[in-house]
């Protein structure tokens, strides 16, 4: 009934959750009501709430059966739940103490008897009277109210069935299934809000395996806060829809595997024999445990907002390209909101005069941009005439086509409006985009995502809102003479196994300039990056950020010592060769940078050198790893991996006025 009850109702005065008396005495000399009515919360995010104060409403449910007014509590804001769990319910408890703290909180708030509630299930609703509360089990002892008010969604499920069900449950109902009925005095609003916090916690926050997690630091910081933030991020369309589906699937898989693990562990504990079947069960249990741990790590990756941003969401694009036409013909698509004679004459003069000397080419005209792109086959060209084009869906480019703006980028503007995950999706083998300005609004993911193949971006302007250009694994980006700005994430995200060439671009006023996701994952190669004559400036964080594991940093600590050892220990030919290679690389790079360096070693040269030093550290780390593997007899399969370099060419880049500097690392 709760869903139906939220459809409408009569507003009533607000009520607040009382704090735990012991915490109130320690933290706030004022009354708990004064504390909860404060207008600001230092722990809350700016975008999570609009109005202060935890409020509850009452409503008269709409339906055939005249149920009494219930207290509505499902519309609480992020910071209201945050404060309740942090300050009044869980505080700094451990996972093993969650039940104890919850019971203690409810004992201070709930009346043990004398209140009514609507027992809500997926099948029926019935009015009950609470005669007692069994706090340790989080259940209420109830009886059917007099007069009995009952409504069922199934005609076959009668009031007699409800009475039978109550008998089976021994009249003990979970508090989460009860919706408190209001009276004119509003004295039960606090109880309703307390039950709502418990209901929400066990539905959206608590996991059955939490008690078996590490219990050394407080549960709120480790689990409650990230899961609560994820819930509201999803609610406010901050998370890609595909990632939401993945998260719920992972959660279901983990719950199912954990259930199997508990059953298996229970059967083993009841078995005293050392039989072959028991040994098989133990192996199965170890496999289940390993699977559960992997699933839990994936869940934590999504729940943590920072890691969710750093690692991103690798969506699998299911869009299939059409390929070439059966007759092999290529078509030129002209997109213009209005076609006038002057524009048509200029277009034919500038664009089609050379084509007239060749074989005949078909030309199609479109007033809608997406229809023009969707009509393309391999080898087609889309010419976009000056104008402001508004799209409400995703521009999916699955074939090798060319998207060409006829004029200056500021004259050909494509603006994304309406909520959605992505703006431009590229999966074609060879996509070319030039002379266009893209403006992003309300998207969850980047303004341009390259999933597969090569995309060339030239003379374009990208006004971002979330992330700029994302280059996924196995994809390739060649970007030249383009401008990327305004991203709340990184201007450019480069994934492992991708290739990225950046020449003469501006990347500015983003959270980070370029984010390189070098996970050192065994399944991926490192990205290959060339950066030439780019201007990376006025970004909130670093100009370039490299993501790498902590173990990577540990291996780097003795890099300089390793170089010195290689130069001294000349009797070891392999070490001498490795040292010379690195020395030659440093000299080569230094010679390339010489024209850009000044007496005071300006910021431009410093930024390039910081990236080059990272290159040398990566090379040395690989050399050390190769040497260790060689000592173990592993040489053949590793040669190709160890010979790769992340930065192919770094020169002439300018780093100016970036908040944290030119180059930084994110360790995980």
Curated annotation (Swiss-Prot):
Subcellular location: Midbody; Cytoplasm, Cytoskeleton, Spindle
Tissue-specificity statement: Expressed in spleen, lung and heart with higher expression in testis. No expression in brain, liver and skeletal muscle. Elevated expression in actively cycling cells.
One Pfam short name: SHCBP_N
Modified residues (Phosphoserine): 31, 44, 273, 630
Induction: Down-regulated upon growth inhibition.
PTM annotation (N-acetylalanine): residues: 2
SMART domains: PbH1
SUPFAM superfamilies from the UniProt entry: Pectin lyase-like
Keyword Cytoplasm: yes
Key words of the record: Acetylation, Cytoplasm, Cytoskeleton, Phosphoprotein, Repeat
One GO term of the biological process aspect: fibroblast growth factor receptor signaling pathway
An example molecular function term from Gene Ontology annotations: SH2 domain binding
UniProt key word Cell membrane: no
Extent of the PbH1 repeats: 428-451, 452-473, 474-496, 497-518, 526-548
Cellular component, GO, one term: midbody
PANTHER family: SHC SH2 DOMAIN-BINDING PROTEIN 1, SHC SH2-DOMAIN BINDING PROTEIN 1-RELATED
Function comment: May play a role in signaling pathways governing cellular proliferation, cell growth and differentiation. May be a component of a novel signaling pathway downstream of Shc. Acts as a positive regulator of FGF signaling in neural progenitor cells.
Oligomeric form and interacting partners: Interacts directly with isoform p52shc of SHC1 via its SH2 domain. Interacts with TRIM71; leading to enhanced SHCBP1 protein stability. Interacts with both members of the centralspindlin complex, KIF23 and RACGAP1.
Protein name (record): SHC SH2 domain-binding protein 1
Organism field: Mus musculus (Mouse)
């Amino acid at each position: 009934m709760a869903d139906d009850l939220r459809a409408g109702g009569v507003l009533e005065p607000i009520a607040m959750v009382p704090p735990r008396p012991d915490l109130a005495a320690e933290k706030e000399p004022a009354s708990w009501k004064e504390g909860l009515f404060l207008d600001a919360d230092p722990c809350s995010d700016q975008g999570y709430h609009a109005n202060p104060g935890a409020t509850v409403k009452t409503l008269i449910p709409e339906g055939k059966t005249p149920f009494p007014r219930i207290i509505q509590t499902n519309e609480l804001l992020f910071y209201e739940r945050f404060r309740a769990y942090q300050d009044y319910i869980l505080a700094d408890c451990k996972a093993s103490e969650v039940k104890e703290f919850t019971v203690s909180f409810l004992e201070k708030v709930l009346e043990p008897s004398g209140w009514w509630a609507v027992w809500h299930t997926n099948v029926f609703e019935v009015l009950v009277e609470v005669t007692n509360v069994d706090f340790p089990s989080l259940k209420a002892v109830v009886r059917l109210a007099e007069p009995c008010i009952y409504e069922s969604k199934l005609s076959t499920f009668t009031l007699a069935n409800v009475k039978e069900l109550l008998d089976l449950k021994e009249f003990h109902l979970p508090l989460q299934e009860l919706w408190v009925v209001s009276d004119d005095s509003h004295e039960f609003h606090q109880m309703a809000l307390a039950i709502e916090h418990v209901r929400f916690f066990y539905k959206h926050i608590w996991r059955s395996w939490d008690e078996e997690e590490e219990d050394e630091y407080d549960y709120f910081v480790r689990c409650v806060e990230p899961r609560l933030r994820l819930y509201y991020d999803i609610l406010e369309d901050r998370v890609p829809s595909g990632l939401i589906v993945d998260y719920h699937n992972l959660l279901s898989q983990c719950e199912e595997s954990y259930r199997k693990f508990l059953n298996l562990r229970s059967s083993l504990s009841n078995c005293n024999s050392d039989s072959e079947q028991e040994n098989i069960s133990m192996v199965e249990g170890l496999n289940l445990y390993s699977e559960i741990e992997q699933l839990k790590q994936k869940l934590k990756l999504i729940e943590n907002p920072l890691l969710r941003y750093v690692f991103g969401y690798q969506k699998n694009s299911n869009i299939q390209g059409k390929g070439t036409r059966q007759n092999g013909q290529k078509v030129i698509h002209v997109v213009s909101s209005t076609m006038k004679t002057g524009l048509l004459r200029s277009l034919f003069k500038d664009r089609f005069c050379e084509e007239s000397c060749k074989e005949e080419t078909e030309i199609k005209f479109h007033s809608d941009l997406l229809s023009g792109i969707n009509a393309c086959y391999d080898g087609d060209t889309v010419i976009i005439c000056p104008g402001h084009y508004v799209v409400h869906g995703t521009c999916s480019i699955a074939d090798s086509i060319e998207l060409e703006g006829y004029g200056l980028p500021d004259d050909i503007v494509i603006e994304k409006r309406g909520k959605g995950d992505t703006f431009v999706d590229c999966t074609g083998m060879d996509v070319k985009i030039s002379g266009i300005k893209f403006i992003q609004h309300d998207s969850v993911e980047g303004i341009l995502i390259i999933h597969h193949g090569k995309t060339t971006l030239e003379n374009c302007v990208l006004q971002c809102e979330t992330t700029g250009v994302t280059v996924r694994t196995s994809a390739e980006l060649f970007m030249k003479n383009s401008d990327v700005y305004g991203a709340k994430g990184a201007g450019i995200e480069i994934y492992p196994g991708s290739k990225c060439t950046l020449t003469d671009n501006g990347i500015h006023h983003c959270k980070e300039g370029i984010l390189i996701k070098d996970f050192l994952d065994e399944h991926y190669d490192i990205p290959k990056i060339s950066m030439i004559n780019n201007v990376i400036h006025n970004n909130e964080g670093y100009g370039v950020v490299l993501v790498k594991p902590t173990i990577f940093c540990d291996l780097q600590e003795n890099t300089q010592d390793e170089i010195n050892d290689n130069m001294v220990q000349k009797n070891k030919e392999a070490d001498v060769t490795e040292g010379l290679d690195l020395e030659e690389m440093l000299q080569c790079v230094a010679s390339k940078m010489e024209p850009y360096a000044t007496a005071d070693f300006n910021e431009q040269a410093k930024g390039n050198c910081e990236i080059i030093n990272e290159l040398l550290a990566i090379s040395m780390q690989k050399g050390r790893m190769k040497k260790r593997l060689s000592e173990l007899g592993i040489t053949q399969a590793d040669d190709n991996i160890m010979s790769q370099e992340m930065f192919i060419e770094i020169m002439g880049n300018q780093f100016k006025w970036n908040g944290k500097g030119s180059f930084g690392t994110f360790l995980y």
